[in-house]
A protein has these predicted regions:
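C-terminal regulatory
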Residues: 1-66, 71-96, 123-134
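A bilobed periplasmic-binding-protein/Venus flytrap-type ligand-binding module shared by bacterial periplasmic
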Residues: 99-109
Length: 134
């Protein structure tokens, strides 16, 4: 839309970009429904808009100015830093995904495997589902 986004409620005047991958692969996430409720936005029909099956397509659409997307910082941090995207609100959904490291008991004792698992835990501890990007 042509209207500025000053409050979360202003999103009703803009095209929302839906990441179907997010909804399928992040248990308990309903995407926009959950974020809008967290932001205290009265219900409206947010189902219209653009729907993509790949998160990177959602981000690309937002960069092209096609709408507003919920995205992960891990995918959009460079675009945010370089000004191709902005985060209009400081409101993040909690991370609900899981990351699993599976190996055999013998290989679990390998120092390289232990180092990898420590690194994976450190990386995963900073993951979150992010606020909208426009």
């Amino acid at each position: 839309g042509d209207q500025p986004i000053r409050t979360p409620g202003d999103l009703r005047h803009h095209t929302l970009i839906h990441d179907e991958t997010l909804i399928r692969h992040w248990p308990g996430s309903s995407g926009w429904s959950e974020w809008l409720a967290l932001a205290g936005v009265p219900e409206f029909d947010y189902s219209a808009g653009l729907h993509f099956d790949h998160s990177d397509h959602c981000v690309d659409a937002a960069i092209a100015g096609s709408g507003v997307v919920l995205g992960r910082r891990s995918m959009s941090s460079r675009d945010l830093e370089q000004g191709r995207l902005i985060a209009p609100f400081d409101l993040d959904l909690p991370f609900r995904g899981g990351i699993y490291s599976v190996t055999t008991p013998v290989k679990a004792a390998n120092p390289n495997v232990q180092a990898f698992r420590r690194w994976l835990r450190e990386e995963a501890s900073g993951m979150e589902l992010n606020s909208p990007r426009s």
